[in-house]
Amino acid sequence: MTKSVHVASALSVRKTATEDTVGSILRAKGNQVWQIGPSATVYEALSQMAERSVGALPVVSDGVLVGIITERDYARKVVLQGRSSPHALVREIMTPSPVTITPEFTVMQCLRIVSMRRFRHLPVIEEGRLCGIISIGDLVAAVIANQAFTIEQLETYISAGYPA
C-alpha cells in the first residue's frame, strides 16, 4: 500500500502533458511569432513559410488577428483552382476569423480541437493580441516529453526498490 502512494506522489511532481498549458509550450518555443499582412501576395506568404519551415502564418492587420493562411489553403484555393500565386493576395485565400485559444488552454483541450476540427495550427491570443501559434507537432511533442518523463520516473522507482 505504501508503494502505490509513493508512486502516485513521485509521479505527481510534474503535471501530465494533458495538463500542461499552451503558455508553457510557448515559453519553451520562444516568443517569436511569424505573421503576414492580408495585402501581401500568396507567393510572399509561401516564401516566408518555406524560409521558416512553418506550415501556417497568422494574418494580422493593425495588430489584430484577421485570419490564418496555411499550406492547405494554398493547395485548395490556388493550386486546385488553377490560380497564379504571384498575383493572388493573402486575404483572398486565408481562413478568416480562425479558431483561437489562450495560453491557459491545456494540451488535451487543444488536441480535442485539432482532432475534431481537423486543424493543424491554433493561433494563441492573450488580451486581444496574437502571442503565438501552436501546431499539432507542438502538442504531440508535449505528450511525448511527458511520457518519457513518466517512464523515467517509473524506472527510477522500480530500480530503487529492487537490487540489480
Where are these predicted regions, by residue range?
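Tandem CBS (Cystathionine beta-synthase) repeat/Bateman regulatory domains
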Residues: 1-164
